[in-house]
Amino acid sequence: MKKKYNISIVGQSNTGKSTLINYLCDKYVSAESKKLQTTRVNLYNSVSLNGMEINFIDTPGVSLQNNDLLSTSMKNAYIKTLESIDLLLLMIDIDNIDLKYEDSILDLANVAKTNVAMLINKIDLAEDDLSELEVLKSRISENYSLELYFMSLKSKQGVTQMVNGICKILETKPPLNNKNIIPVNQKIISMQEIIRGVIIELTHGDVPYDTAVHIETHVTKKKIIEINANIYVNKDNQKKIIIGKSGSMIKKIGIESRLKLELIHGKQFYISLKVLVKENWKNNYILLKEIGYID
């Protein structure tokens, strides 16, 4: 019987967390974007590596500045996750290093006595100045006692070494929690996040960050999955943007969402989308709980 381990991937937005998940799972399972707040809830994906079953948890890129209820729930996800994982992977973008942020995460990990490995991504951006990598390596080694991996998900440089390294870390101790920690509504939440990921890519300004998706109903049949979902926005003008001229944008969102979901689930999808204005929804406890942003 394979040992089951739980690994959480954390880091600021746009460090490559979702890209790493998709690479390890060898398929598209998590929305990727250069924009902030691509991931708002923990997303779970299992994969077999080196004879072990590893459950990767893609966590939100938390904004430490925002104080709305949504941001608070995202921050709380960090703390709750730390209580049930075997290893924390802290991802850093080599082109955007702010160790003050990392310090706050490492402090939480230290309190929870969680093993940590630091992944420095996008080293291809520093290929012309290798001395920069050595300086960074020395700087981190002087301040932190943890495993350190330099890699590039774009060029795949250092990725194999990183995977082998984290597996060796896990092999040194038995799993902390061999039980299934994946929420029962994870499938629905992941569908919602895929649709929201499409909206993020197709819209601009404040629209991507003021949008939430909630699947009201879903019916799974033999060959097709039917879902009816609401898209929530803060303002009337945002609703107009989501719908688009003569419904062009909402149609495009539906088509691209359907294609991504069919690729992931291997079934046909029928998607019905409705756009609703819900002012200040980020502080609406009931709605956030219905969507799955709050347990």
Language model feature labels by segment:
Residues K187-D295:
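P-loop NTP-binding site
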Residues T114-A117, D124-K187:
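Canonical P-loop GTPase G-domain recognition
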Residues T59, I92, M151-K154:
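Cofactor-binding loops of NAD(P)H-dependent oxidoreductases
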Residues M1-L82, L87, I231-Y232:
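Conserved G1/Walker A P-loop phosphate-binding module
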Residues S30-S33, P174-N178, E201-A212:
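Active-site phosphate-binding and catalytic loops of NTP-dependent enzymes
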Residues T39, S63-L64, I97-D98, A126-E127, ...:
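Catalytic P-loop NTPase motifs of RecA-like helicase/translocase cores
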